[in-house]
């Protein structure tokens, strides 16, 4: 999907997307919701230091919207530097079969939680395109984890999380897409 607004084709009843980056002791987060009535995609961007405290103070939290796939600030100001070239993973990368052919399946990291119906499957892979999205060297070893919910799957309520971590650095992100 090139534009965030194109998600309405897959999720006509609306959607929410969270994209969270962790690096250099900083959390950068983009949260948006797609309104099915107006077809507008609005949300917030947040920057805050990663601390081991209950109430992490946000350096800033600002309202955003998307127009033709581009992030815009609700107040008309410039998009902060760390979000200037922001694209969701689903806009930038598609997990094709060839990715899984070349990835190493990590059986120890496969899990199903009976009490919650949550599951995840982890892979280790080297993928230049995904490394570029994570802004690490192209030959970096990546841990890629897919998460979902069996009960939601059975009820045709779509929720997927992709979690990517560069193994040799402390840089990671996750993206969650949820159908409303």
Features from the language model and the residues they span:
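Extended lipid/amphipathic-ligand handling interfaces
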Residues: 5-6, 29-36, 143-152
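Short, flexible beta-strand-to-coil junctions
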Residues: 19-27, 45-53, 163-170
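N-terminal leader/targeting segments and the immediate start of mature chains
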Residues: 1-26
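Extended amphipathic alpha-helical interaction segments
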Residues: 80-115, 128-131
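An acidic-aromatic
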Residues: 29-88
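Gly/Pro-enriched, hydrophobic low-complexity segments
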Residues: 119-180
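Short, hydrophobic/aromatic-rich segments at coil-to-beta transitions
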Residues: 12-18, 40-42, 115-122, 157-160
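Short solvent-exposed loop/turn micro-motifs enriched in small/polar/acidic residues
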Residues: 25, 102-105, 139-143
């Amino acid at each position: 999907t090139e534009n965030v607004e194109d998600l309405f084709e897959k999720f006509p009843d609306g959607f929410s997307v969270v994209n969270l980056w962790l690096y250099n002791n900083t959390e950068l987060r983009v949260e948006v919701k797609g309104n099915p009535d107006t077809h507008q995609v609005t949300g917030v961007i947040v920057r805050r230091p990663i601390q081991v405290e209950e109430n992490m103070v946000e350096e800033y939290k600002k309202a955003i919207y998307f127009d033709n796939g581009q992030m815009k600030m609700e107040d008309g100001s410039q998009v902060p530097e760390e979000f200037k070239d922001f694209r969701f993973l689903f806009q930038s990368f598609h997990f094709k079969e060839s990715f899984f052919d070349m990835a190493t399946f990590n059986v120890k990291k496969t899990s199903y939680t009976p009490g919650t119906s949550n599951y995840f499957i982890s892979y280790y892979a080297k993928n230049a395109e995904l490394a570029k999205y994570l802004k690490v060297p192209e030959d970096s070893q990546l841990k890629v984890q897919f998460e979902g919910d069996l009960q939601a799957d059975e009820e045709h309520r779509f929720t997927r999380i992709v979690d990517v971590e560069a193994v040799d650095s402390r840089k990671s992100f996750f993206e969650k897409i949820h159908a409303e």
